[in-house]
Design a protein with these regions (language model features):
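One-carbon transfer enzymes
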Residues: 1-121
Length: 121
């Protein structure tokens, strides 16, 4: 079975994580300390998790304890350092809610709304 490490935040992160966990083995989760739904999900499903700022090696000191095929980032609050990106056995990717670079950042749909657009392209 394909093994994954998931970096996610907020409701979008939780919804995506819940769906992914039905099909794949989640070895670890990185999230922020305010994503209570993700923390509860990890706790209830016995998935090891790290909360807080992963920068300066803090996240990697946790991640290096796991071997995963894929690392996926979904609406993750923090910038991801190179050591985490390179840790997967085959692929690390980010799911973003718009075409880059116009709406970069975590909430492209919000800025599209503010600008009166119907799509975050």
């Amino acid at each position: 079975m394909l093994t994954l490490g998931i970096l996610c935040s907020g409701r979008l992160g939780l919804n995506t994580l819940s769906k992914i966990a039905k099909e794949y083995a989640i070895e670890f989760i990185l999230t922020d300390s305010n994503s209570f739904g993700i923390i509860d999900f990890a706790t209830n499903n016995h998935i090891p998790f790290f909360t807080g700022n992963p920068r300066k090696g803090n996240g990697y000191s946790f991640v290096r304890n796991f071997s995963v095929d894929v690392i996926a980032s979904i609406n993750y609050l923090f910038l991801i350092e190179k050591d985490i990106i390179e840790h997967s056995n085959s692929l690390t990717f980010n799911i973003h809610g718009s075409l880059l670079p116009k709406y970069r950042g975590r909430t492209p749909h919000v800025w599209a709304n503010i600008n009166g657009e119907t799509k975050a392209e």
